[in-house]
């Protein structure tokens, strides 16, 4: 595996973690939203990753070098919490308001995990860059 593959692999991870952070941001932004006129509340989105062999992306001879890609973004189908508040403008006929199914604590943990993974891959790129520069300096 060449050093340039390190950058490509880390870049796939950065892209994937960025999408994960976007989903977390969307989930947290909608954590306290209620069902709309259609009766449907916001559903938390989850990002699923899949291994991506770099040989499949056009790199010859590096079939065992694996990056990552987003395979799917799904909506959590668990029902949102229902609160009895008959005076709320979004209350149904029984006086219940349906909120999103976002668990803010889980989302914060997910955000910390995605952020750390993103930072780790930046560190991988910085280390690879430093090694390449040192290799070039040895040739002088």
Q: Locations of the language-model features?
A:
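Amphipathic alpha-helical polymerization modules
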Residues: 1-140
């Amino acid at each position: 595996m060449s050093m340039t593959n390190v950058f490509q692999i880390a870049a796939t991870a950065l892209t994937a973690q960025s999408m994960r952070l976007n989903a977390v941001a969307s989930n947290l932004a909608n954590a306290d939203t209620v069902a709309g006129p259609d009766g449907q509340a916001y559903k938390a989105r989850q990002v699923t990753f899949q291994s991506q062999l770099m040989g499949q992306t056009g790199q010859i001879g590096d079939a065992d070098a694996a990056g990552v890609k987003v395979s799917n973004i799904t909506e959590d189908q668990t029902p949102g919490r229902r609160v009895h508040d008959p005076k709320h403008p979004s209350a149904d006929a029984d006086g219940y308001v349906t909120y999103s199914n976002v668990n803010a604590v889980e989302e914060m943990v997910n955000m910390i995990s995605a952020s750390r993974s993103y930072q780790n891959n930046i560190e991988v790129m910085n280390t690879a860059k430093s090694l390449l520069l040192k290799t070039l300096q040895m040739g002088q």
